Amino acid sequence: RRQRQMCIRDRPYGIGTKTPEMHADSIEGLFSQLPGVRVVMPSNPADAKGLLLASIENNDPVIFLENLHLYRSLKGEVPEGYYTTPLDQAAVAKEGSDVSIIAYGGTVPLALKAAEQLEKDGIKAEVIDLRTVAPLDIASIGKTVEKTGRVVVVQEAQRTAGIAANVMAEISERFVLNLKAPIGRVTGPDSIFPFAQAENDWAVKAEDIVNKVKEVVDYD
């Protein structure tokens, strides 16, 4: 029987452009529950190209989600020619030793911004870009937990039943003895996505990440 690859490039997700109704929904948590389906969420232009080409090549079904706000707010160098970025592998977006900020998609730039602010206060945050949220790269997650012992997980979606909860569960089951403090979580609230100016109050901000990181670092 002939085998065919299937990559579903879904509509953009995420808030930040004040779009109406359900354009801003982050539904990666729902997609991640589908057995055998990969869910890929790039955070920068170079990865967007490499991960998309890798998704097309992959024999498993892949759902490829692109952050709407990053379309308009982020620029970056993209290598010419054909290349792929490995699926199922997280990336270290910034090295650090005091705390790990685990993010993906549109929250990675926020995590990097927060890490810059934290560095001014003497806190060296490591930023992990998951890139593929289903399946999770457990090895990379474990490596950063063992390195820093403190973790904050960030997602744009609502708090309940999301990727952040999955990451926290995996850490609690596999690496709890490496933790020096309870895991922190920064998410959107459990409510309907707003639109227009109301987005400003709903959205996750770098300041929220900074505050949560300080709470985790100061835990005694």
Task: Describe the residue ranges of each PLM region.
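Thiamine diphosphate
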Residues: 16-18, 68-220
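A glycine- and small-aliphatic-rich helix-loop capping segment at beta-alpha/alpha-beta transitions
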Residues: 1, 23-30, 170-175
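Short, small-residue-biased leader/transition segments that mark boundaries at the very start
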Residues: 2-8
